[in-house]
A protein has these predicted regions:
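Core catalytic lobe of class I
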Residues: 2-199
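Short, conserved SAM-binding/catalytic segment
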Residues: 1-8, 202-215
Length: 217
């Protein structure tokens, strides 16, 4: 396996191709894959061509690996129109509706206010099939064109895993999943092809989090 780009207690970040790194991970060594792959809608990335055709190739490559290495995998389907294709190729075990509220991007009849999330794995987990968390991270937050809110990551991590479990984010981006794992006492393996975003993720990990609960005790 390639050497880690960054490592601290419970957090390891690799700068490289996620498919190459995941091939080195043992079967069922990950408790949860929580990630947000490229959307295939021509977003501007410096290290990846975000075309729709590349999205199909990527999806068909990553899902078998997720199912091999992880107990549970959760990821956005990105485009509602792709659900028919997804159910024909790699049908999920569960589908969750993420309602973004007024922060969702406006679209035809407001359909972009919600996004389907794919769940692979049959581990017994306690979640509803409906998630309401505002997408309050602005486009360009932390230098990334499409960040997920940290509350989104923490919601899944806290419900699907226990303290000390290992979470994998093979499209780490600006490091939201890694930061959430650090806050919640989980181990995290992050993979990111862009060195720029690896550096941003490392910087986020070094930020102190103000604990209001401790102050109010």
């Amino acid at each position: 396996m390639i050497s880690p780009y960054y490592q601290e207690e419970n957090i390891t970040i690799y700068n490289g191709d996620c498919l190459e790194v995941m091939k080195e991970l043992p079967d069922k060594s990950i408790d949860l894959v929580l990630t947000d792959p490229p959307y295939g809608v021509d977003l501007k990335y410096s290290d990846y061509v975000d075309t729709e055709s590349n999205w199909f190739d990527l999806f068909e490559s990553i899902i078998p690996e997720f199912k091999r290495i992880a107990d549970v995998s959760i990821l956005p389907s990105c485009q509602i129109k792709r659900l028919e294709y997804i159910y024909k190729t790699f049908p999920p075990d569960w589908l969750i509706c993420w309602y973004k509220g007024s922060a969702g991007t406006s679209g035809f009849l407001g359909f972009n206010d919600w996004e389907p999330l794919l769940v692979y794995g049959k581990k017994k987990i306690y979640m509803h099939d409906y998630l309401a968390i505002n997408n309050n991270e602005k486009m360009g937050s932390y230098g990334h064109p499409c960040p997920k809110p940290i509350g989104w990551a923490k919601w899944f991590i806290s419900r699907v895993t226990n303290e000390g479990d290992t979470i994998l984010d093979p499209f780490l981006g600006s490091g939201t999943t890694a930061r959430a794992c650090k806050d919640l006492g989980r181990k995290c393996i992050g993979i990111e092809i862009s060195q720029k975003y690896c550096d941003i993720a490392v910087k986020r990990l070094g930020q102190e989090v103000f604990n209001f609960a401790e102050v109010n005790q």
